Curated annotation (Swiss-Prot):
It comes from Neisseria meningitidis serogroup A / serotype 4A (strain DSM 15465 / Z2491). It comes from the Bacteria. The gene is greA. PROSITE patterns: GREAB_1. Necessary for efficient RNA polymerase transcription elongation past template-encoded arresting sites. The arresting sites in DNA have the property of trapping a certain fraction of elongating RNA polymerases that pass through, resulting in locked ternary complexes. Cleavage of the nascent transcript by cleavage factors such as GreA or GreB allows the resumption of elongation from the new 3'terminus. GreA releases sequences of 2 to 3 nucleotides. This is Transcription elongation factor GreA. GO terms for biological process: DNA-templated transcription elongation; regulation of DNA-templated transcription elongation.
Length: 158
């Protein structure tokens, strides 16, 4: 079974979501189903159908989260001994050579990725171009608009 890479923070967020689904959402939907049942005929009960649909979503998400956490390979960036190389979990500051803008990204797992928060998926084109590089190197990224070049300004393990 293939391991799913997660940062410590990413694993914690999945655990929190799982706990919320089990302790809050699941009991609420069970109560909503019971309430809808009390209204009688289930064949034309939209409230019942909606609650059952929501229950299916919740149970599916619980199963998905339990599976991901069971196969997670949790990586703590502060414990990485990568000798300055960019690896999973690394936070890296780049300079776009065309615009001279600086951007900072953390390379994370698929479930953690959020470009608005500066978290990029390890399988994304930019992350793949950065992996293995060091401070001072230049990375070429194949983007939809063509090749972009970035200087690697800083590599941190935080």
């Amino acid at each position: 079974m293939q391991k799913i890479p997660l940062t410590v923070r990413g694993a914690e967020l999945l655990k929190q979501e799982l706990q919320q689904l089990k302790s809050v959402a699941r009991p609420e939907v069970i109560e909503a189903i019971a309430e809808a049942r009390s209204h009688g005929d289930l064949s034309e009960n939209a409230e019942y159908e909606a609650a059952k649909e929501r229950q299916g979503f919740i149970e599916g998400r619980i199963s998905e989260l339990e599976h991901k956490l069971s196969v997670a390979h949790i990586i703590n960036p502060t414990e990485i001994h990568a000798e300055g190389k960019i690896v999973f979990g690394t936070t890296v500051t780049l300079e776009d050579l065309e615009t001279e803008e600086h951007v900072t990204y953390q390379i994370v797992g698929e479930d953690e990725a959020d470009i608005k928060q500066g978290k990029i998926y390890v399988g994304s084109p930019i992350a793949r171009a950065l992996i293995g590089k060091e401070e001072g190197d230049t990375a070429e990224v194949q983007a939809p608009g063509g090749v972009r070049e970035y200087d690697i300004i800083e590599v941190r393990y935080i």
